């Protein structure tokens, strides 16, 4: 098998079919799809069995208890056989030639990340296509958490590093930080092949997001290369400001600016400070 697509899911009955189909309907056909149900209680496991149980390319597993998505992704890797490992969240989708183009861009790289620009709603309608500009410096992108979506991430099998199961959010960012610090080579491509679904149940917010961001901070603040530390600190500071932790947020922000004043020569960062630090509507 050339490619393994690993899809962790918890209570994702509403979207899992679209996700699996977007993996099965790729122009690249030598694919196995591994679904790991994390002890859902909404009938997701039974639904996937009914819809895909007779599809040879789809392998369906169920955790004996809720183990969180890092465990599920790691388990999926352990039972996979592909030369290339792709991850897809249960609520996201890919355009039809995503896998094909990703494999073409591996070359001597260990990880290929495809910048997601299309965001869809619960019905699959396009909400927006991002025109955000990204730095060409891969390390800057990683340490400032501008790349992290698992659905946009693919590994060569022999270079895969396990997700940290001590994190129940920000595990994707933490993994990329480890990847850079361990010397893995990352290719970032901007081809708009990954579609991120926005909906009420998406777990990219809440207090857990803040707490796990702070966990990354304390785990890695002394390991980040000096020239990239301001970008790391800025991201943590804007997260603190976002959640109303103004004193701590401003202290960290000022530290980042002191280390590298040029970090403010970026309209997005200025906008973030105005919005979160001063509560200005922009």
Feature names for model-found ranges:
Residues 1-3, 24-35, 43, 56-59:
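Short loop->beta transition adjacent to catalytic acidic/histidine clusters or analogous donor-positioning motifs
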Residues 12-25:
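Short, well-formed alpha-helical segments that are part of the catalytic scaffolds
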Residues 22, 37-46, 65, 89:
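A conserved acidic beta->alpha catalytic loop
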Residues 63-80:
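Glycine-rich, basic loop-to-helix element that forms the pyrophosphate-binding segment
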Residues 85:
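Short aromatic/hydrophobic "clamp" motif used to bind/position activated sugar donors
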Residues 97-127:
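Conserved donor NDP-sugar-binding/catalytic core segment of glycosyltransferases
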Residues 114, 132-210:
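Conserved nucleotide-sugar donor-binding catalytic segment
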Residues 184, 192, 196-231, 248-259:
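Catalytic core of nucleotide-sugar-dependent glycosyltransferases
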């Amino acid at each position: 098998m050339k490619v393994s697509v690993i899809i962790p899911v918890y209570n994702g009955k509403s979207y899992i079919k679209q996700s699996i189909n977007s993996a099965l309907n790729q122009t690249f056909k030598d694919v196995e799809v591994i679904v790991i149900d994390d002890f859902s209680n909404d009938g997701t496991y039974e639904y996937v069995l009914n819809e895909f149980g007779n599809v040879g390319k789809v392998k369906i597993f169920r955790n004996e208890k809720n183990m969180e998505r890092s465990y599920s992704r790691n388990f999926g890797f352990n039972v996979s056989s592909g030369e290339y490992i792709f991850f897809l969240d249960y609520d996201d989708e890919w355009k039809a030639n995503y896998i094909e183009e990703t494999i073409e861009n591996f070359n001597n790289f260990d990880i290929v990340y495809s910048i997601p620009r299309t965001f869809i709603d619960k019905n699959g309608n396009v909400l927006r296509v991002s025109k955000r500009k990204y730095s060409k410096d891969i390390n800057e992108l990683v340490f400032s958490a501008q790349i992290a979506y698992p659905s946009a991430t693919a590994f060569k099998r022999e270079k895969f590093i396990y997700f940290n199961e001590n994190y129940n959010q920000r595990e994707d960012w933490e993994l990329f930080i480890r990847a850079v610090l361990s010397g893995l080579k990352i290719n970032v491509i901007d081809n708009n092949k990954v579609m991120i679904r926005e909906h009420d149940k998406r777990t990219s917010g809440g207090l857990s997001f803040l707490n796990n961001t702070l966990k990354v901070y304390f785990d890695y603040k002394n390991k980040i290369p000096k020239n990239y530390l301001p970008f790391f600190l800025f991201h943590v500071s804007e997260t603190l400001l976002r959640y109303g932790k103004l004193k701590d947020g401003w202290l960290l922000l000022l530290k980042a600016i002191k280390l590298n004043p040029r970090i403010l020569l970026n309209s997005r960062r200025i906008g973030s400070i105005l919005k979160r630090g001063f509560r200005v509507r922009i």
